[in-house]
Every structure is written in C-alpha cells, then in structure tokens.
C-alpha cells in the first residue's frame, strides 16, 4: 500500500466539513502539584505541601475537543452533576465551536480524578464519582439528542461512569441512523467497560488490555485476539492499541486486510489520553478517505503527540504537521 507524506498533509487540510456527535462520560482530570516534606516516624505516612492544581477536561470531553481542533463540526452530549466542576466543564466549552448538550443529574457528582504529583511522580489518585446507571429519563434525553442531530458519525466514548451499560447501549445504539458511521471505545483501565457490548459498529478502538479483559483471554497472540474481538463485536474496522508497540489495524472486508503501525512516540511524558486522540483522528480520517491505512497512521501520530505533553490537551492539526515534518527530516526526505 503506497503511503506518502504529501497525501497525509493533503488529508489533514480537508477535515473541516465533517460533522460528528460524541456521546459519553466527561471527566475532569486534576493534577494537584505538591512538594515532598517528609514522612512520619511512627506510621508509614508521607507528608506533602500543596502547591496548586491544574484542571483538564478529559474522558469523552477531550475526544470532542480533539475533533474540534482537527476542524470537525462537533456536537457533544454528556451528563454532569450539579456542582462547581460542572460549571467548569460548561465554561471550558464556551470558547469553542462545540455544541454542548450537558444533561444535569443532581443525584451524582461530576466525575473528577485527582492525581497527587510530586516532582513529576504520581503518588496517589483520588476519584470522586458515581458509576450507577443513569435514569431512564436521562437515557431518553440522550437518545433524543442522537436522533435529532444530523451528523456523519456518532462516537460512543465509554468510561463506565453511568451513561453506558448493557441496558442503555442497546437503546442508544438503536437511536443512531443506519447511514451514520458508528464508532465505539470502552475503557477498562480501572472500570468494568466491555467493548463486546457494542455490536455491529463500523470502528472500534480497544487496547490490548481491554480486548483481553473482554474475552477473558491472556494467552492468545495479538492476531488471534484481534480476530476474536471482531467476531464477537461484528465490527467492520478494528484498531487494536498496543501501547509502546503501536497498533494493529484490521479491516473485515473482501480483502480482510491487517497490518501493524509502530509507535511514533519519542519521549513519553503523560500517556493518559493518547487513545482519545487516536479515536478522534482515526474516525475523521477514515470518514474522509475510506482508508484504514491513513486512518491508523494519522491516528497514531495524534496519539504520539498526546503522549509527549503533560495533561490532556486537544491535539491540533498543526502539531501533527510539525510531527510529520520532523519524521521527514529524520528520514532525510526533506
């Protein structure tokens, strides 16, 4: 398959008219900065001095922001608590072109994951959340939002904080127009997500751990793992994320194409959120090109940039273009 830097650059400049609806759990990622003071002599307790914090919109929220940064016209539907963090989330979308539908659930807090950091070491994470299933009323509101929004693609970004479960996935999936490109990603880093619950989607992007968790399979080769995941989900396209080993891309078609893409990461600073960048850009590129090759490559480039910065920030097209320029120079092609 012939791939050129010129074609990648051309594709990146043509993403402005794509309409995408992101549905999923928003997370406020907090980095609390501290300095180490010392430890107690009587108990195994260490002491740190608080030095401030940075908040980032993560989860499905950053997926929406990646898409917008790429030039797509984005609608984002999520559930928030009735608290200060929900106001922060809403405010963070005010200066963007994203159409936010924030459904307030007074029975739950806005999901917050607070990492305590000392000298770039992550000492502890404190979560504030409620993973109980959303009410039928809220599910109906999300369903109506999906039905009324005319888009090219719907992305379900599942972090298992209430929106998606066995009951709601069926209803919400059924609300998507059959002509719309359906994408799903389900996180199980510390939760109980299950990508196999998203049936007949066009593209799914689990990582290796999520795939093995879904299948209860720690022994199969990567190739067999990918095959089993596609068989159980009936998905057309699969990008299986392999961390520092890159990604395996599989297309179930007449060609039954499968190929590996190596990692483009040079210096890992913060890998959290890399999969969200891949999810966003891979979706847009496939919609534009119908090529899983370019979708996988550009998605992996976006993920590598996300790994090389601290905090969960939207990846811009200009950053990917700069990365491509850097790679061209390393290969002595420029």
Predicted segment positions?
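Flexible inter-domain linker/hinge segments
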Residues: 1-11
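Conserved N-terminal subdomain of the carbohydrate kinase-like
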Residues: 17-20, 28-155, 173, 178, ...
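Active-site metal-binding loops of divalent metal-dependent hydrolases
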Residues: 25-26, 159, 277
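Short glycine/proline- and charge-enriched loop/turn segments
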Residues: 38-49, 203-207, 257-264
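Short acidic loop-to-helix transition motifs that present clustered carboxylates
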Residues: 85, 109, 161, 186-192
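Conserved post-catalytic alpha-helical subdomain immediately downstream of the catalytic base
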Residues: 234-236, 264-328
């Amino acid at each position: 398959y012939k791939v050129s830097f010129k074609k990648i650059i051309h594709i990146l400049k043509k993403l402005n008219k794509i309409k995408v609806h992101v549905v999923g759990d928003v997370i406020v990622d907090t980095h609390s900065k501290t300095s180490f003071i010392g430890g107690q002599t009587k108990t195994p307790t260490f002491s740190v001095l608080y030095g401030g914090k940075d908040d980032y919109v993560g989860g499905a929220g950053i997926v929406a922001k990646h898409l917008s940064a790429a030039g797509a016209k984005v609608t984002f539907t999520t559930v928030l608590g009735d608290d200060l963090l929900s106001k922060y989330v809403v405010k963070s979308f005010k200066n963007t072109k994203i159409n936010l539908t924030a459904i307030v659930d007074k029975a739950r807090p806005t999901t917050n994951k607070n990492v305590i950091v000392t000298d770039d070491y992550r000492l502890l994470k404190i979560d504030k959340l409620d993973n109980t299933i959303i009410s039928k009323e809220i599910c109906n509101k999300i369903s109506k939002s999906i039905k009324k929004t005319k888009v090219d693609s719907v992305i379900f970004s599942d972090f298992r904080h209430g929106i998606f479960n066995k009951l709601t996935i069926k209803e919400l999936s059924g609300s998507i127009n059959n002509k719309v490109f359906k994408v799903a990603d389900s996180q199980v880093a510390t939760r109980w997500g299950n990508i196999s619950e998203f049936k007949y989607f066009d593209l799914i992007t689990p990582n290796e751990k999520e795939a093995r968790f879904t299948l209860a399979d720690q022994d199969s080769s990567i190739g067999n793992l990918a095959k089993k995941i596609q068989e159980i989900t009936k998905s057309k396209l699969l990008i299986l994320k392999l961390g520092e080993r890159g990604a395996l891309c599989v297309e179930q078609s007449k060609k039954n194409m499968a190929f590996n893409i190596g990692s483009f990461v040079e210096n890992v600073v913060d890998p959290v959120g890399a999969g969200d960048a891949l999810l966003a850009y891979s979706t847009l590129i496939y919609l534009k090109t119908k090529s899983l090759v370019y979708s996988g490559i550009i998605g992996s480039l976006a993920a590598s940039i996300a790994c090389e910065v601290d905090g969960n920030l939207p990846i811009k097209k200009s950053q990917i273009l700069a990365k491509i320029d850097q790679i061209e120079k390393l290969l002595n092609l420029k």
